[in-house]
């Protein structure tokens, strides 16, 4: 039904962003990676959309790139992988890191995702390894690093926590740029608070 939504970025919550278009605020669930790339409130953005309709739920899932949206759809095609687990996998590291892990059979990397056990990780690798183009491996190698070096999910959670404490999104984003991104959410928040109160 939806291909993409263009509008003003209005804010972030734990697992979704809000985009206003023609007076309507759209609640869009997204990955930590897309959350961490959001501009300041009020700026125009374009988010590619997948609508999920179930008997008890209708939701919009959006991403900053078609590539990330396509990966989300691929993950949903795996039996046992729901939207929440797919978003978690897209949040633990950059997209190329995830592809690299699938292509090389790195179950340990995939198991870092919420709700992803060894059995499902193995199924993801088995079913998606051949669907991801082999030449993508070369593109992924140069960008692959340990997930703790690109902890976008922790950053998005830290951002939400700082905003809930009364800091503006701009203030929070500014200090989070300088924190050690390999730390846990708790330590990232502590470091940010030291900078904000200093």
From Swiss-Prot:
Annotated stretches, region: Domain III: 154-198
Organism the protein comes from: Clostridium botulinum (strain Alaska E43 / Type E3)
Keyword list, A-Z: Cytoplasm, DNA damage, DNA recombination, DNA repair, DNA-binding
Pfam families documented for this protein: HHH_5, RuvA_C, RuvA_N
Comment on protein domains: Has three domains with a flexible linker between the domains II and III and assumes an 'L' shape. Domain III is highly mobile and contacts RuvB.
Annotated NCBIfam families: ruvA
GO molecular function annotations of the record: ATP binding; four-way junction DNA binding; four-way junction helicase activity
Assembly behavior: Homotetramer. Forms an RuvA(8)-RuvB(12)-Holliday junction (HJ) complex. HJ DNA is sandwiched between 2 RuvA tetramers; dsDNA enters through RuvA and exits via RuvB. An RuvB hexamer assembles on each DNA strand where it exits the tetramer. Each RuvB hexamer is contacted by two RuvA subunits (via domain III) on 2 adjacent RuvB subunits; this complex drives branch migration. In the full resolvosome a probable DNA-RuvA(4)-RuvB(12)-RuvC(2) complex forms which resolves the HJ.
Record region (Domain I): 1-64
Family affiliation: Belongs to the RuvA family.
CDD domains hit by this protein: UBA_RuvA_C
Keyword Hydrolase applies: no
Name of this protein: Holliday junction branch migration complex subunit RuvA
Compartments (UniProt record): Cytoplasm
Major subcellular location class: cytoplasm
A Gene Ontology term for the protein's cellular component: cytoplasm
GO biological process terms held by the UniProt record: DNA recombination; DNA repair
């Amino acid at each position: 039904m939806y291909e993409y939504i263009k509008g003003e970025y209005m804010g972030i919550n734990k697992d979704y962003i809000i985009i206003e278009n023609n007076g309507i605020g759209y609640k869009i669930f997204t990955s930590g990676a897309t959350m961490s790339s959001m501009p300041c409130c009020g700026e125009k953005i374009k988010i590619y959309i997948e609508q999920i309709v179930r008997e008890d739920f209708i939701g919009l899932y959006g991403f900053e790139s078609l590539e990330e949206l396509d990966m989300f759809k691929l993950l949903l095609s795996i039996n046992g992988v729901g939207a929440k687990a797919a978003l978690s996998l897209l949040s633990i590291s950059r997209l190329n890191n995830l592809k690299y892990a699938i292509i090389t059979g790195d179950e340990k990397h995939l198991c870092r995702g919420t709700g992803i056990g060894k059995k499902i990780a193995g199924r993801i690798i088995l079913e998606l390894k051949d669907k991801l183009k082999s030449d993508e491996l070369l593109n992924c190698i140069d960008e692959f690093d340990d997930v703790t070096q690109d902890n976008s999910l922790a950053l998005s959670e830290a951002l939400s926590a700082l905003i809930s404490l009364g800091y503006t999104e701009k203030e929070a984003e500014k200090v989070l740029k300088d924190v050690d991104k390999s730390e846990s959410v708790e330590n990232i928040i502590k470091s940010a608070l030291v900078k904000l109160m200093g």
